[in-house]
Amino acid sequence: SLRHLNAFSKEVEFLSPAQLTEKDLSNIDLRIQPWGWDRAIATYLLGINPQLEQFLPSNEALDTIRNISNRSFAACSLLPHLVSLSNDLIGDSIYFTDSHEKVMQFFNDNPALYVIKAPWSSSGRGVRYIDNRVDESNKGWMKNILEQQGGLIIEPYYNRVLDFGMEFYASEQGEIEYKGLSIFSTENRAYSGNLLANEAIKEGIVNQFVKQELLQLVQTNICSQLASAFKGKYVGNFGVDMMVVTTDDATTFKLHPCVELNLRTTMGHVALALSPTDFAPKRMMKIDYLDKYHLAINLVGDDLLDTNL
């Protein structure tokens, strides 16, 4: 049931685009925080009410946000630093800006399981999987991405045990605030839902595989590394997707500390906002699609299978 969401409705004033068009914004203290920033949303808001211009990021700022949103930023800057912190961390990523022919030569010389990512894509898209050989569909897709976006991110395929993430907020003062853990589920490699539980329960799930000290080490270093990278460039929510992986012999667990850097509000932030108090039961927030998307929040028992949420 979503009846418990009514507690938040008193804090929200809904405005239609027509109402926003007529609203006088000349003497108002306003901060706009969309799900994520890009030129499309800035142009859309400006078209609704020209007075919004003073509250919008400049074109230069939007370009900077786009550059940081490029998957190569996390792959080439954040991930290598985090992995160097401990032998219990794992993760490798290559950013190719070579010709399509050289990329194909790489796969011919190094047959294995790979994850291929476009530098920019909407959530859950722009990702392909290679199983030892590149089929014609993936060849064409990679050629198009190289031509349109100028690069490809190539990563090893890992044996995933648990998907989760850490959620943050970047302030105007250049400080990074840790908001909490996000333990989420996927279906057919796409997001499907989040566990709603207090931090102790979520930490307990992850700690079945990796120590809390390792999580704290990763969290602290994400805050310190991105504080300097984001200062004066980005203000708002962001999340870092992670995963617990196992070795080929399934005897050792390691933490991949940066599968994705999402420079926007995430469903993990939504889950944190809806998470219960310490004494409330666990819930599962699920997104289903029939004729349209549906959000459902249901109770889950203590026998929840933690690695298959």
Description of each model-found segment:
Residues 229-239, 287-289:
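Flexible, glycine/charged-enriched surface loops at secondary-structure junctions
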Residues 2-105, 121-122:
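Conserved N-proximal alpha/beta basic substrate-recognition cap immediately N-terminal to
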Residues 168-226, 262-289:
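ATP-dependent carboxylate/phosphate-activation module, predominantly the ATP-grasp catalytic core
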Residues 111, 138-192, 239, 243-258, ...:
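Phosphate-binding site of ATP-dependent enzymes
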Residues 2-5, 41-49, 125-128, 164-165, ...:
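A short acidic (Asp/Glu
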Residues 92-96, 113-139, 165, 189-206:
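Glycine-rich phosphate-binding loop of ATP-grasp-fold ATP-dependent ligases
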Residues 120-121, 158-162, 231-236:
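A short catalytic or substrate-binding loop motif that flags glycine-/basic-rich loops and adjacent residues
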Residues 280-309:
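Peripheral (often C-terminal) accessory segments that flank ATP-dependent C-N-forming ligase machineries
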